Design a protein with these regions (language model features):
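Short, charged low-complexity intrinsically disordered segments located at boundaries
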Residues: 1, 92, 159-160
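Negatively charged, low-complexity tracts enriched in Asp/Glu with abundant Ser/Thr
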Residues: 3-78
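Compositionally biased amphipathic helical and low-complexity segments enriched in hydrophobic
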Residues: 5, 36, 75, 80, ...
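Short, flexible coil/linker segments at or flanking structured domains
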Residues: 32, 82-84, 117, 124
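Amphipathic alpha-helical coiled-coil segments
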Residues: 44, 48-58, 122, 129-143, ...
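Hydrophobic stripe of amphipathic alpha-helices that form coiled-coil interfaces
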Residues: 58-61, 65-76, 136, 143-146, ...
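Amphipathic, interaction-prone secondary-structure segments
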Residues: 63-99
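Intrinsically disordered, low-complexity regulatory segments enriched in Ser/Thr/Pro
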Residues: 93-132
Length: 160
């Protein structure tokens, strides 16, 4: 057992040193905000409204990404990016389509990348675009899932 004086000096030195380095006090205050439970329906409604604004921004981002890719990199190919989603989905995802708008799916990208007449630079650019598409789709899916869950929670609160 450490004597009380030594224990206080040791703990005090460690705590003071930690709080001075890297602004831990500010970080701890920030992190505590994430750990607080929602206090009520009003906070859920505010969060839902923020997420719906994010969904509108993501919808426009999908349109912009598709337009830029289709008018630039993919212009001379038979491959397009298309914003897609079921009716009522807040944020649309980006899907691969053929330029005739008859087929959709990842298999179109795989078929395009397996062609021998595609330059290595073009292949790498399309792969980079696919990475951007995947990241965007993950963001859109998170927004959609969160809005759906908040809607269910609000409905449960109404029925309680």
């Amino acid at each position: 057992m450490i004597p009380l004086e030594s224990q206080q000096e040791h703990e005090g030195g460690r705590v003071n040193g930690a709080s001075k380095s890297y602004g831990n006090d500010a970080f701890n205050s920030y992190a505590k905000g994430f750990l607080k439970p929602f206090k009520g329906k009003g906070e859920l409604i505010r969060l839902r409204d923020e997420l719906e604004e994010s969904a509108r921004a993501a919808r426009q981002e999908a349109i912009d990404m598709a337009s830029q890719a289709n008018g630039g990199l993919l212009k001379s190919t038979d491959l397009w990016l298309t914003p897609w989603g079921k009716s009522g989905v807040p944020a649309r995802t980006l899907q691969w389509r053929d330029n005739r708008q008859k087929s959709m799916g990842l298999w179109l990208l795989e078929a395009f990348l397996s062609r021998d007449d595609i330059s290595e630079a073009m292949r790498q650019s399309v792969i980079d675009l696919e990475v951007q598409r995947c990241v965007f789709n993950a963001k859109a899916a998170t927004i959609n899932w969160s809005i759906k869950r908040i809607g269910k929670a609000l409905a449960d609160i109404e029925h309680a």
